[in-house]
A protein has these predicted regions:
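Active-site clefts of carbohydrate-active enzymes
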Residues: 162-167, 271-307, 331-335
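Glycan-recognition and catalytic regions of carbohydrate-active enzymes
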Residues: 332, 342-389
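Aromatic-lined substrate-binding rim segments of carbohydrate-active enzymes
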Residues: 119-185, 207-227, 260-263
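C-terminal beta-strand-rich structural cap/linker in extracellular carbohydrate-active enzymes
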Residues: 427-447
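Aromatic/acidic polysaccharide-binding cleft in carbohydrate-active enzymes
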Residues: 296-353
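Carbohydrate-binding surface patches
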Residues: 374-411
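Active-site groove signature of glycoside hydrolases
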Residues: 181-211, 215, 232-256, 323-325
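N-terminal carbohydrate-binding accessory modules
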Residues: 72-126
Length: 447
């Protein structure tokens, strides 16, 4: 079992060698049963790996304390874990590979944000490549049934149920009101076959962290069968929210004012902010900012092109995303005066269909060879094994042509492209890429 604690030595002007740290494991009764030095202590993280089977079944607090060499305290942090004799069966949970498992099978959420569920639009959506949706308007039973009938899962929004916040329902004035409404939703839909996850946080500020953490604990108690998903624009503050979610997403919407490579930067940072221990379902842009602007400001916007949407989706996957929920389906209708829905929908489906085709690969947990990338920092790689084949994704996250060399440990016999330009083979295990701007390339390597 890996244990990690965030440190802020760099911000404090302290070097790692100037301090020491220790992890203490305590029972629910407060008895310390183990004290361990970290396996590694760096400027921003202390890590330890322990054998959980050494601990009797029960609840534990893990506390990390940081001190100077002379014994002066530099702070502490703690978390909880529950040691079980056997992992309980869950309808939906996140496994050790950060994949969502639904009814015992890996599931890659491929969906879009909705406003409210409307059956005529649902009919159109169900014919596309998507397997889930996240409607802001929390669905009723009839709408949940309609989604299930079409083979669609629902990420159910309870993100507004915080009294005193902007979008809280008018009658929600107290914590008791929040609890009553959440219990009601869990009772109504916790066992519904369409339910995939609970959407608990949509870009809430950091000063809400304590309330968000309490909400996470509540959802773990009320419905341990489904994970929670939070989405932030504060991509470089994710670490401060770690106690508030099971799954995290961030939502880079760069087009047209910023480079499409923001998708790569945000996903890399999101992954690293979680110590690469949490599932990441990213929220790439498919909408036109003009849907939210007027007059001259609206005229300055445009929708992302098919090339940009493809690149941003694969940038997210390459940097570690195990789910994609695009923003947004409902905005595709708002710009029909200059971008007909039919054309935009066709482009969105073409992009998502490419991801859907490779979902069996993206969900593989078979041990894959390590790869190293030499060249532009704008290139991200990720590798999977599926049977006797190795799949290597490499994405150029910049709007310029770049080159990079990827070295595959153990080498390979042949290479062919699933999409993108086939890289040049040069030496044992070496692939030399000449990327077009924003180009994603997926190759299949045979050993």
């Amino acid at each position: 079992m890996p244990v990690a604690a965030a440190t802020a030595l760099a911000e404090a002007g302290i070097q790692a060698q100037e301090v020491s740290g220790s992890f203490v494991f305590e029972t629910a009764a407060g008895k310390a049963v183990r004290t361990s030095k970290p396996d590694a202590l760096t400027r921003d993280c202390a890590t330890l790996r322990v054998n959980a089977s050494d601990f009797p079944v029960g609840d534990y607090t893990v506390r990390f304390a940081l001190a100077t060499r002379d014994g002066g305290s530099k702070g502490s942090a703690e978390t909880l874990f529950h040691r079980v004799a056997k992992l309980p069966e869950r309808k939906a949970f996140i496994d050790a590979h950060r994949r969502l498992i639904v009814d015992g099978k890996p599931f890659f959420p491929l969906g879009m944000y909705w406003s409210g569920v409307k059956e005529p639009e649902l009919e159109t959506y169900a014919k596309g490549p998507f397997n889930c949706l996240m409607p802001y308007g929390s669905p009723d039973k009839q709408q949940m049934d309609a989604c299930h009938a079409r083979g669609l899962k629902v990420i159910y929004s309870i993100k507004d149920f915080y009294s005193g916040t902007h979008w809280a329902p008018a009658g929600m004035k107290t914590e008791a009101d929040e609890l009553a409404e959440i219990k009601k939703r869990v009772e109504l839909f916790g066992n519904h076959p369409a339910l995939l996850a609970w959407y608990t946080n949509d870009e809430m500020p950091l000063n809400m962290a304590d309330r968000l953490a309490a909400r996470q604990r509540l959802m773990e108690e009320l419905d341990p069968d489904h994970p929670t998903w939070a989405v932030l624009y504060q991509y470089d503050q994710v670490r401060a929210y770690l106690s508030t979610f099971d799954v995290i997403g961030t939502d880079p919407y760069p087009i047209p004012e910023k480079p499409a490579g923001a998708a790569l930067l945000w996903t890399r940072t999101t992954r690293d902010q979680t110590y690469n221990t949490r599932a990441v379902w990213q929220v790439p842009q498919v909408f036109d900012w003009g849907a939210y602007r007027k007059g001259a400001e609206r005229d300055k916007t445009r929708a992302p092109t098919l090339q940009e949407m493809r690149s941003m989706a694969w940038q997210c996957v390459a940097a570690g995303a195990n789910g994609l929920v695009f923003y947004s389906f409902f905005d595709l209708f708002k710009m029909k005066d200059r971008d007909p829905f039919e054309k935009r929908w066709a482009d969105v489906c073409a992009m998502a269909e490419e991801v859907k085709r490779l979902i069996p690969v993206l969900l593989s947990a078979e041990p894959a060879p390590s790869v190293t990338c030499e060249g532009s920092a704008s290139v991200e790689t990720r590798v999977w094994r599926s049977g006797s084949d190795v799949y290597l994704l490499a994405v150029n996250g910049t709007s310029e042509a770049v080159t990079a060399t990827v070295v595959v440990a153990g080498g390979f016999k042949s290479v062919r492209a699933e999409f993108g330009n086939v890289p040049e083979r040069k030496g044992d295990g070496h692939l030399v890429y000449t990327f077009a701007p924003l180009e994603p390339v997926m190759v299949r390597l045979s050993e």
